[in-house]
Amino acid sequence: HARERLDDLYRPYLDGENVSRYKLTWNGEYVKYGENLAAPRDKEIFEKPRILVRQIPSKSAYAVEAVYTDSDVINDLNSMVITDIQVNPFYLLGILNSRLISLWFFMKFDKFQRRLFPQFKVNELGDFPIPYAMDSQQEEIAKLVEQLMEEMKKDSPDTDIVHQLNLKIDDLVMDLFDLKEEEKQIVRNFVV
């Protein structure tokens, strides 16, 4: 690790704490990425559009912390990488970051009852239910997600805008799962 880019092999480095819901931060560290590493991962996963999912979930109604990036950055093993995205990536991001998926995650894996630092694994991520959606439905969620990501980039995001966008995304996700109004209310009231 280095605090400055010493040559072209040094690339921005992210650890798990740099990955949060809809926002990617960077603490100014670089890593020399190449043959010098004992077990380098395929560098292509760091060069293409992808979703990073933090391995340690938040203990909140929005437990899953995922963000989209197409930047040339290296992430550590505390973030899982989704590169084989078969749908609109912002749609997928909205599903993963939704309150409904957090509730499902909480009930399915019971992570917060067992350990101080709960983690979820790649195979568990593969179990996440991703509903079928027509292109127009994907686009509707994707546009809201992109608005939310833009708001989150600001030094001081407007909490009312963030809250309203989260609610809209959550409602659209619940619609895709055909939840009844009573079921939607259970999801809306979910807290950890």
List the model feature ranges, each with a label.
Residues H1-Q138:
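Polybasic, glycine- and aromatic-enriched phosphate-binding surface used to engage nucleic acids
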Residues L9, E17, I130-V192:
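Non-catalytic DNA-recognition/assembly elements of restriction-modification systems
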